[in-house]
């Protein structure tokens, strides 16, 4: 018997090919995520969101730290929320909401300069639509990557939904204290009335809370809240609501 010897060749993969492969996987995952967000938003054109990313995170922490506690949230239709609260939020959070495209370039640039001066992210320059994008899908983490994703989701919201629907979802999902979400829950938690009965002064005080709802919940009746509420109350008359209002 004659033995035949041969040479075995080991196939190596170049680093460039690995980089291309990894990049393709990352791009595919990123695209799938964006399509998921877009599909969810399209569904919410006619179906109300059951919960948000913020609510789910809060529910987990409450179940761990305060087992009996639960998220307080009750969806109510747009026309069952006081116009006072709508005007107060626009006056406080996004005065051009009815006419802008979801972005306030001046506010974003101002936030950029402020963050650069501080050496860290302390401001975001977010419109109502940007806040909604963050609440629905993202986290409270402050990073430029999260901000970039927020801007993309904002574009999706503004493209798929009309302004009134965006505002309706916002009003029903924004946080007003730990475990307190939406106008109805906030009105009952702080004033023991439905959101439809909120007066101008009550609405102004609720609007003040939005940047730091948990802090204001723990420091009710602060002098700053009263002063800021007075400023918002004066601006409410000029607040422009979405066209159908």
From Swiss-Prot:
GO terms for cellular component: peptidoglycan-based cell wall; plasma membrane. It comes from Burkholderia lata (strain ATCC 17760 / DSM 23089 / LMG 22485 / NCIMB 9086 / R18194 / 383). One of its GO terms (molecular function) is peptidoglycan glycosyltransferase activity. Its main location: membrane. One of its GO terms (biological process) is regulation of cell shape. The keyword Cell wall biogenesis/degradation applies. SUPFAM superfamilies: Lysozyme-like (SSF53955). It comes from the Bacteria. Pfam families: Transgly. The lineage of its organism: Bacteria, Pseudomonadati, Pseudomonadota, Betaproteobacteria, Burkholderiales. It is found in: Cell inner membrane. This is Biosynthetic peptidoglycan transglycosylase. Keywords: Cell inner membrane, Cell membrane, Cell shape, Cell wall biogenesis/degradation, Glycosyltransferase, Membrane, Peptidoglycan synthesis, Transferase, Transmembrane, Transmembrane helix. Peptidoglycan polymerase that catalyzes glycan chain elongation from lipid-linked precursors. The gene is mtgA. Its EC number is 2.4.99.28.
């Amino acid at each position: 018997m004659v033995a035949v010897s041969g040479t075995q060749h080991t196939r190596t993969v170049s680093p460039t090919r690995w980089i291309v492969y990894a990049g393709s996987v990352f791009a595919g995952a990123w695209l799938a995520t964006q399509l998921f967000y877009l599909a969810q938003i399209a569904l919410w054109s006619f179906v109300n969101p059951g919960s948000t990313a913020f609510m789910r995170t809060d529910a987990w922490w409450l179940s761990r730290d305060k087992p009996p506690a639960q998220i307080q949230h009750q969806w109510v239709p747009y026309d069952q929320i006081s116009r006072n609260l709508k005007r107060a939020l626009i006056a406080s959070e996004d005065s051009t909401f009815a006419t802008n495209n979801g972005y306030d370039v001046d506010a974003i640039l101002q936030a950029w300069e402020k963050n650069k001066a501080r050496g860290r992210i302390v401001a975001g320059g977010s419109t109502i639509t940007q806040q909604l994008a963050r609440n629905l899908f993202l986290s409270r983490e402050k990073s430029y990557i999260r901000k970039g994703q927020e801007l993309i989701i904002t574009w999706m919201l503004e493209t798929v939904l009309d302004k009134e629907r965006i505002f309706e979802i916002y009003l029903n999902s924004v946080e007003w204290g730990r475990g307190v979400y939406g106008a109805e829950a906030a009105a009952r938690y702080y004033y023991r009335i439905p959101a439809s009965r909120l007066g101008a002064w009550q609405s102004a005080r609720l609007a003040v809370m939005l940047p730091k709802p948990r802090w204001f919940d723990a420091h009710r009746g602060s002098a700053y809240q009263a002063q800021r509420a007075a400023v918002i109350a004066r601006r409410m008359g000029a607040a422009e609501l979405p066209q159908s209002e």
